[in-house]
A protein has these predicted regions:
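Short, histidine-centered active-site or binding-site loop motifs used for metal coordination
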Residues: 4-8, 68-69, 75
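C-terminal helical "tail/cap" subdomain of flavin- and related membrane-associated enzymes
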Residues: 30-33, 75-77, 92-171
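Short, cationic motifs built from Arg/Lys/His that form the positively charged side of catalytic pockets
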Residues: 1, 13, 61, 113-114
Length: 171
């Protein structure tokens, strides 16, 4: 899977498959001896780099989970993980409610889910800011980004933090 940052407002009509391959080849030129192996694209889409958390995940008997409650940018690959953890928390709570008349899980669902959601949001946004340049960023932000990339490249501790978050936090 490859991601190429495009300007806000771009459309797929501006990015035929050949242009995507040319852009990737240009970016990998000099980095990889093999270059880019071209082939048919399975999917081409534009994914907005946005985050959102709807902090009210329960209204009476209605519970929100997954994308209805939170959106993360694709950079951190956390969307499906968060949806699965929401469903795991909620299913445990519903089972306890219907089998044992225990509502503690339903009462605590929102707080428990949000604690994990905000950690994943933080990580996804960190990676997004680390890997992407935004038009509103100035010279200072660009230098900070380069300094952070340099720090990550040279710090085993920071690489461990990124790996732990990328693999996924425990339920």
């Amino acid at each position: 899977r490859y991601y190429i940052q495009v300007a806000q407002g771009e459309t797929l009509a501006n990015w035929p498959e050949e242009r995507l391959w040319d852009e990737l080849a240009g970016r990998f030129d000099g980095i990889s001896e093999q270059g880019v192996t071209r082939g048919p694209a399975l999917e081409i889409s534009i994914a907005p780099l946005r985050s959102y958390v709807f902090e009210t995940m329960r209204h009476g008997r209605l519970f929100l989970a997954g994308d209805s409650a939170h959106i993360v940018p694709p950079t951190g690959a956390k969307g499906l993980n968060l949806a699965a953890s929401d469903v795991a928390y909620l299913s445990d709570a519903l089972i306890a409610h219907y089998r044992r008349d225990d509502d503690a899980g339903l009462t605590g669902y929102q707080a428990k889910a949000l604690a994990r959601i905000w950690k994943a949001e933080r990580f996804s946004w960190y990676l997004t800011k680390l890997m992407h340049h935004f038009p509103e960023d100035g010279a200072f932000e660009h230098r900070m980004q380069i300094a952070e990339l340099d720090y990550v490249a040279g710090s085993e501790a920071m690489q461990t933090v990124i790996a732990e978050n990328y693999v996924g936090l425990p339920l």
